[in-house]
Amino acid sequence: MVWTYWNLGPDLCEAQAPGKAQRSAFFRRLMQDLAYPAGTSTFWPACLPDSDAMPASPAPAEGEDRSRYQPNADVFWSGVQALHARAVVVMGSVAARALGLPAGVRPLQQLRHRGTLVWVLWDVEFLLDEPQRYAAMLAFVRRALQQISRR
């Protein structure tokens, strides 16, 4: 299973990405709560650095425009195929648009895109700000994972 969210690109590329520590803690908790075996999940970014826009220093300035990260749906979906992922979890509408998912997809929705089962969740930052949604999201993911683990 592949997980992605818009800020995964900055989280992988920038040691001091704003909010990185909170997102990392969120995913550690989520993976622990799901209790799936190691190697079941991987993370693949929905956006990549625009090499022409990357500064010499990897640390972003306060309030820096993050537009130096660009979506590349073709790279993402070819990575999903190369990883032989049985499903993709897309967190947030920005990531969903970046990956070319149909307009109007909503959190806690399942669809097929490019032949792959996709589950759309709320954005990580939204879940951090609205912790009462965590239980609903966790229940949805557990049910969804049962679909692919039976195959």
Where are these regions (language model features)?
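A polyanion-binding, active-site-adjacent surface
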Residues: 1-151
